[in-house]
A protein has these predicted regions:
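Electropositive, gly/pro-rich neighborhoods at or near active sites that engage anionic ligands
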Residues: 2-150
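A general structural motif
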Residues: 150-152, 179, 237
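Short glycine-rich or small-residue beta-strand-to-loop segments that form or flank ligand, phosphate
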Residues: 152-158, 183-185
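Gly/Ser/Thr-rich loops at beta-strand to alpha-helix junctions
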Residues: 158-167, 189-191, 245-249
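Histidine-anchored nucleotide/phosphate-binding helix
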Residues: 160-178, 182-183
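Short connector loops at secondary-structure junctions
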Residues: 182-199
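C-terminal functional extensions of proteins
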Residues: 186-187, 200-288
Length: 288
């Protein structure tokens, strides 16, 4: 999906906030001009995650990384691992896929690519009130029918922390669909707080299903940047589940037709999908 005007404005605003505390005004102006050039050249023909990757490369020329994502990722991986058994018990009590989907959407709140920081109280509130989240029961039924007939599922993860919920969901799918071969795909390199192979290993996902990197350090799944292995997995998967905004922005209208699972975290998505802030978005592309 090509970045629209509001995405472009959001990207620019994030970059200005990112460098605001730097004291060298001339350096800041030069950097912002470089950002504007990238937005002008690529903002009308590429998705937001790809544009942000180009900006990230320019940022490295001017500044050292100002966020220790390794520490943040470890913190939220451990934060969610501590809640794993409680969440698993709640899912098993409800004994349905719908509850799993609500949890993985709630966990999508853990997104440093969009927010400057995570409100732990808000995150806990989303997890505590997961039964109050609304998703389409009809869409759940569609997914269940497809999984019952499919032999292969590709599950594309998004952020750290929430990958623990992805693991629980995948295990529930394994229990329900015994003949379903599931592969998980993570980012191929560091991209904000997105989950990589290191995160998959830390939270135990690699002990549950085969996990592959997508070949790119981008906050999404950009077809042209994927490894041949990742392209092959996408092409051959009978069902694809794609988590998060970055995957939606990079996969929509790219002939992959996944089920999108994410949390509404911005006004554009609120208006586009007709949902309230911090409510789940769950749908298959062909029915959007």
């Amino acid at each position: 999906m090509i970045a629209n005007s509001r995405c472009i404005a959001c990207i620019l605003s994030k970059q200005e906030r990112k460098i605001r505390k730097n004291s060298d005004e001339q350096k800041k102006k030069e950097y912002i001009h470089k950002v504007l050039k990238i937005l002008y050249e690529y903002g009308t023909k590429e998705c937001a995650p790809m544009v942000e990757k180009r900006i990230k490369d320019i940022y490295k020329e001017y500044y050292e990384e100002d966020v220790d994502y390794a520490a943040l990722k470890h913190r939220y991986n451990q934060y969610m691992l501590e809640k794993e058994e409680e969440i698993r018990a709640h899912i098993q009590k409800n004994n349905d896929i719908e509850t799993c989907i609500k949890y993985v959407c709630a966990g999508n709140y853990i997104d440093f690519g969009l927010a400057n920081k995570i409100d732990d109280q808000l995150l806990q509130g989303l997890l505590d009130k997961v039964n109050e989240l609304k998703i389409s029961k009809k869409e759940v039924a569609y997914l269940e029918d497809e999984l019952a007939q499919a032999k292969t599922l590709l599950y594309i993860t998004d952020n750290c922390g929430e990958i623990v919920l992805d693991k629980i969901f995948i295990e529930e799918l394994q229990n329900k669909y015994k003949n379903l071969q599931i592969t998980a795909m993570v980012r191929g390199g560091i991209a904000s707080n997105d989950a990589t192979m290191e995160d998959a290993e830390e939270i135990g996902l690699t002990n549950v299903v085969p996990v592959i990197g997508n070949g790119a350090a981008i906050m999404g799944t950009v077809k042209e940047q994927l490894s041949e292995e990742a392209k092959e997995k996408i092409q051959n998967a009978e069902v694809i589940i794609a988590k998060g905004m970055g995957n939606f922005e990079s996969m929509y209208q790219e002939e992959m037709n996944p089920y999108y699972l994410l949390l509404c975290k911005c006004e554009l998505y609120k208006e586009t999908f007709g949902v309230e802030m911090f409510q789940p978005i769950f749908c298959k592309e062909e029915r959007l």
